Amino acid sequence: MLLRRVIPFAQPIEKVSPGARPSLVQVGRDRELLRLRAKIIHSAGYTVHSIFPDEATATVRKVSGGRVWVFCHTLEFYELALLAVAIRHSCPADRLLRLTGLNDVQQPQGLFDEWLDSVRGVDELLQVVGRLAKQSALGQ
């Protein structure tokens, strides 16, 4: 009889308490996509909050800085621009990641810290999130 072998996603290098986990907020319109991405990012050791665009402005005002924001390709440009400007103004230590889609128009530089094609793999997403989380922790 063969034993089952479990292959984990990415494991955090060191165990952290839930309060010490880096915080990530993802904003999008597709509930299922947000749920799946949250599971993947959470498995790598992050606290993930998934919200819709209409909830984002209230979230910016509620929580202090030091987070990574992930903007899904399902958002419209005007939503992206308004949210990015609000976050930059209220929480300058936060880092912003834009997941791009096939039909994205050229967007102004400086709104986001990083861009990532939404069809890239999980490993690349986690690398970019990790890099931005370190930058946001240093910026606090």
Model-derived features: positions:
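Short, structured coil segments at secondary-structure junctions
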Residues: A44, P92, G110-F112
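Short hydrophobic/Thr-rich beta-strand motif most characteristic of the beta2 strand and flanking loop
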Residues: G45-E55
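Alpha4 helix (beta4-alpha4-beta5 surface) of REC/receiver domains from two-component response regulators
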Residues: L82, L97-D123
